[in-house]
């Protein structure tokens, strides 16, 4: 499929051919869900923890004798039924990350990119298009791409002045090509890829 290549003013400066193997994949919501759930699980800190009976400080003595008190028998004041006692089967420190097949991860990225193309929310930017020096310039530049709520720009590298110009814009995120992922693509309304990024993605995803 052929799409327009635009500059930072959203003026057409050329054409680029997009591989249907990467940007023309059928929508698979189940794959998107699997990949997003996997990403969110990896982000969890896993620092939740409650005290089990060995963690609770206090005496280990039996509170009162076993029989002839008229009360239920007890063996420890640190038991879960007492105030300040332990928690049974509570959360512990652990990693929530799990493995997901590489082919599923690649397919999820293809589906997310294809969905943006089908919704006309993917813009291919000329490699020399990111010439921004001030936040005011960046605000005007992204306004040229329409009334989208948020923008994700993916390029191979960024100059420091471009990053400084965009970091104060709450609806614009810059991402390097190596870090492109399904969750960030779905969280942003408009995805802007440079021509170089498109070629890198096709060479990376067409083989798997």
UniProtKB/Swiss-Prot annotation:
GO molecular function: rRNA binding; structural constituent of ribosome
InterPro entries found in the cross-reference section: Ribosomal_uL4, Ribosomal_uL4-like, Ribosomal_uL4_dom_sf
Keywords per UniProt: Ribonucleoprotein, Ribosomal protein, RNA-binding, rRNA-binding
Entry-linked SUPFAM superfamilies: Ribosomal protein L4
Pfam families membership: Ribosomal_L4
Domain of life: Bacteria
Keyword Iron carried by entry: no
Gene Ontology CC terms, in alphabetical order: ribonucleoprotein complex; ribosome
Subunit structure: Part of the 50S ribosomal subunit.
Family membership noted in the UniProt record: Belongs to the universal ribosomal protein uL4 family.
Function: One of the primary rRNA binding proteins, this protein initially binds near the 5'-end of the 23S rRNA. It is important during the early stages of 50S assembly. It makes multiple contacts with different domains of the 23S rRNA in the assembled 50S subunit and ribosome. Forms part of the polypeptide exit tunnel.
Protein name as annotated: Large ribosomal subunit protein uL4
Species of provenance: Anaplasma marginale (strain Florida)
Gene name as annotated: rplD
